Structures are given as C-alpha cells and as structure tokens.
UniProtKB/Swiss-Prot annotation:
GO terms for biological process: transcription by RNA polymerase II; transcription elongation by RNA polymerase I; tRNA transcription by RNA polymerase III. Part of the RNA polymerase complex. This is DNA-directed RNA polymerase subunit Rpo5. It comes from the Archaea. HAMAP family: RNApol_Rpo5_RPB5. It is found in: Cytoplasm. It comes from Sulfurisphaera tokodaii (strain DSM 16993 / JCM 10545 / NBRC 100140 / 7) (Sulfolobus tokodaii). Keywords: Cytoplasm, DNA-directed RNA polymerase, Nucleotidyltransferase, Transcription, Transferase. Belongs to the archaeal Rpo5/eukaryotic RPB5 RNA polymerase subunit family. It catalyses: RNA(n) + a ribonucleoside 5'-triphosphate = RNA(n+1) + diphosphate. It is an enzyme of class 2 (transferase). InterPro entries: Arch_Rpo5/euc_Rpb5, RNA_pol_subH/Rpb5_C, RNA_pol_subH/Rpb5_CS, RPB5-like_sf. GO terms for cellular component: cytoplasm; DNA-directed RNA polymerase complex.
Length: 84
C-alpha cells in the first residue's frame, strides 16, 4: 500500500448526493427575511464537511441544498455553515 498516493472521490458526483450551492449575501438575506429567522436558527453544517469544502463554504455562509423527491418533486433546504 502506498502512503504517498491518496484516492480522491468527488461525493457530488454520486446520484444520492443532492445539489449544494453557497448563497450570495443578497440571496441569504432574502431567504432569512422570508423565513423570519437568524442564520444560527437554520440547521448547521460544519465547514469541514466534504461537500461544504467542495463548494467552498466558509463559516457564516448559507448553503442551499436542492433534493429530488418522488413525492414532492423538488425540496429545497438550507444549512448554516459553522466552523469545525
């Protein structure tokens, strides 16, 4: 086994991983205003999460996750990026 070679896998290419995207400041403000909440009230995702790293999310960002659903077509959820 070679210690110098590492296998890199892109989890976003897996069919079960939904689309993740970092919202702009304007988009984040609009969503928070619509929901009537503060960013910290959203479910959290750590900046060290493989998908958060892949999309370049930093603590304080909000990630939009778009999932396909057999019952409701498409579901959009949001995550607040925390350190760690």
């Amino acid at each position: 086994m070679r210690s110098s070679s590492k296998i890199k896998i892109d989890p976003s290419q897996h069919e079960l991983v939904p689309k993740h995207e970092v919202l702009s400041i304007e988009e984040a403000y609009k969503i928070l205003k619509e929901l009537g909440i503060k960013p910290e009230q959203l479910p959290w995702i750590r900046a060290s999460d493989p998908i958060a790293k892949l999309v370049g999310a930093k603590p304080g960002d909000i990630i939009k996750i778009t999932r396909k659903s057999s019952l409701s077509g498409e579901v959009v959820v949001y995550r607040y990026v925390i350190s760690g």
